[in-house]
Amino acid sequence: DLHLLSRRQRQMCIRDSGTSDIAVISLGGTVVSASIKIAGDDFDEAIVRYMRKKHNLLIGERTAEDLKIKIGSCYKRAEVDYMDVRGRNLVTGLPKTVKVSSEETEEALRETTAQIVETIHSVLEKTPPELAADIADRGIVLTGGGSLLRGLEDLISAKTGINTMTAENPACVVAEGTGRYAEVMEELGK
């Protein structure tokens, strides 16, 4: 549970509606933030491009999303999952099935997730020292549907050295938080 008016800070990586917004929140306001035009659809598009380049296989965004949800990962995992992916062979024009591994999805998503990590680094570099120390102690919280991508917590933790966790019910937490914030601000205004 994030407390919007708390003196203890958190960094949030909010991922929805076509952008990834990375922000340091303190005392009910944004201290430092940055946005990049990357969201869940960009993960799907990266998988479509990878399948075309690596396997000469044309797949749709729905198939890419299914692959992402079922076995997709952006960080090495102990176990490797596989999925048969159907599409159109770009050489012959005929239907083709390819067995794809979760390791391949990591490769497909590498460039996109690297941009998110770079933006987090940028926000941390601009964060006042006291707030940065608090973030290092308390961690980074991921919200939004994109935060459900397997391995994202581990990737961000590995690249920043900061514990990273996904909020409970991440797809709804932004809307719920906005509602709570409005209630608190209304009470303070009275």
Residue ranges of predicted features:
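Residue-level signature of catalytic and energy-coupling elements of molecular machines
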Residues: I14, I47, L67, I120, ...
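Single conserved hydrophobic/aromatic residue that forms the stacking wall/gate
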Residues: D1-C13
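Acidic, glycine/GT-rich loop-and beta-edge segments that sit at the periphery of enzyme/chaperone cores
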Residues: G60, R180, V184-K190
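Conserved phosphate-binding/catalytic loops in two-lobed NTP-binding clefts
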Residues: D154-G179, L188
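Phosphate/ATP-binding catalytic cores across multiple sugar-kinase/actin-like superfamilies
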Residues: A108-I135, Y181-M185
